[in-house]
């Protein structure tokens, strides 16, 4: 199951006037120039995974604006990545205090992860619940589709009607070989389901043949669908008229008997959708590779995704699928969903069944 990590805040500010006055030798324009330089250097270093360098730059920025929540959050994030958990905990708490009544949900994501590493179990649950509840609050005014008041049709064990959907692009063995392994495991774990891979021409032909040899469907996305991030391709299964139920999974995550037991519990329920959270870092409303549902609710998914992308309401391409699910799918899904949550983050969640 994908280990979903929090997003960088990336929000160093223009220096508040009161703080600039403490640096009388530096005028406001010069101060903002210095902050921008540190911010840009921090962002570049963090994107490259050089958190030691990112830390040096964001630390200098915090020295200039010590009470700014965004700067403190970025500092805590780099400390988290550097495994300086006590420092990260301190600065996340300072960032929350500096935020007043407007706390960024990402702060709770980071604190949940930090508390896990510090073995602060009760605080991990506390901040995990805040991470989930604040995201729910962010979506409360988003549009939703209607779900029929009746139960979904009973599950039929016809593998052609039940699809486990993956996106696959490129030749990286981490994704290609894991995908092939999943097709083998799915034959044993998910005999009532068929694996389907939405791919483009960057996937080696030999990989495609090996997937098909193991019973998987290989679907080449269209030229217009290619314009979307590959992370979205697997969602196209949602409006396939030949599909009755679907599961969305990550190409680099192994299917398991644990998740199958949870899926079977969903199939026996009267809920239209299913989602799972099974790690301390699972503080998003819908983990992009850990959910599923019944067909017939969402239509014209390609246009639905394009409409969301056009809004620009996401912090970066790495998490664009997560934010689409948060703002465009969750408001509908939440009306009828079975949530398996081993972390106790969701008040409506239940533990995973025995298997």
Cite the ranges covered by each PLM segment:
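Short coil turns that delineate tetratricopeptide repeat
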Residues: 32, 66, 100-102, 135-136
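Catalytic core and acceptor-binding pocket of nucleotide-sugar-dependent glycosyltransferases
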Residues: 130, 294-355
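Active-site-proximal specificity loops/subdomain of glycosyltransferases
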Residues: 203-243
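Start-of-helix register in tetratricopeptide repeats
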Residues: 36, 70, 103-106
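Conserved donor-nucleotide/metal-binding helix-loop-beta segment in metal-dependent transferases, i.e.
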Residues: 257-284
């Amino acid at each position: 199951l994908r280990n979903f990590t929090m997003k960088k805040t990336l929000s160093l500010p223009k220096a508040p006037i009161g703080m600039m006055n403490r640096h009388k030798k530096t005028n406001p324009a010069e101060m903002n120039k210095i902050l921008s330089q540190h911010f840009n250097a921090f962002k570049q270093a963090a994107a490259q995974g050089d958190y030691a360098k990112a830390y040096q730059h964001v630390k200098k920025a915090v020295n200039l604006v010590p009470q700014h929540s965004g700067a403190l959050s970025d500092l805590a994030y780099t400390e988290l990545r550097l495994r300086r958990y006590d420092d990260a905990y301190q600065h996340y708490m300072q960032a929350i205090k500096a935020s007043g009544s407007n706390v960024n949900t990402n702060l709770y994501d980071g604190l949940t992860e930090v508390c896990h590493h510090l073995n602060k179990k009760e605080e991990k649950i506390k901040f995990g619940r805040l991470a989930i509840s604040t995201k729910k609050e962010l979506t409360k005014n988003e549009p939703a589709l209607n779900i029929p008041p009746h139960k979904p049709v009973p599950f039929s064990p016809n593998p052609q009607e039940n699809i486990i959907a993956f996106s696959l692009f490129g030749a990286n063995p981490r994704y290609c070989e894991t995908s092939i392994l999943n097709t083998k495991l799915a034959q044993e774990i998910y005999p009532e389901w068929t694996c389907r891979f939405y791919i483009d021409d960057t996937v080696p032909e030999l990989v495609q043949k090996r997937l098909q040899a193991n019973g998987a469907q290989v679907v080449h996305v269209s030229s217009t669908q290619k314009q979307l991030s590959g992370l979205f391709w697997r969602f196209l299964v949602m409006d396939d008229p030949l599909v009755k139920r679907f599961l969305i999974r990550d190409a680099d995550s192994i299917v398991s008997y644990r998740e199958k037991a949870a899926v079977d519990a969903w199939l026996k329920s009267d809920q239209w959708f299913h989602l799972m959270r099974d790690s301390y870092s699972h503080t998003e409303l819908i983990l992009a590779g850990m959910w599923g549902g019944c067909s017939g609710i969402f239509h014209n998914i390609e246009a639905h995704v394009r409409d969301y992308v056009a809004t620009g309401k996401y912090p970066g391409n790495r998490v664009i699928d997560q934010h689409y699910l948060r703002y465009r799918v969750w408001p509908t899904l939440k009306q009828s969903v079975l949530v398996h949550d081993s972390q106790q983050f969701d008040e409506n969640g239940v533990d995973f069944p025995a298997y």
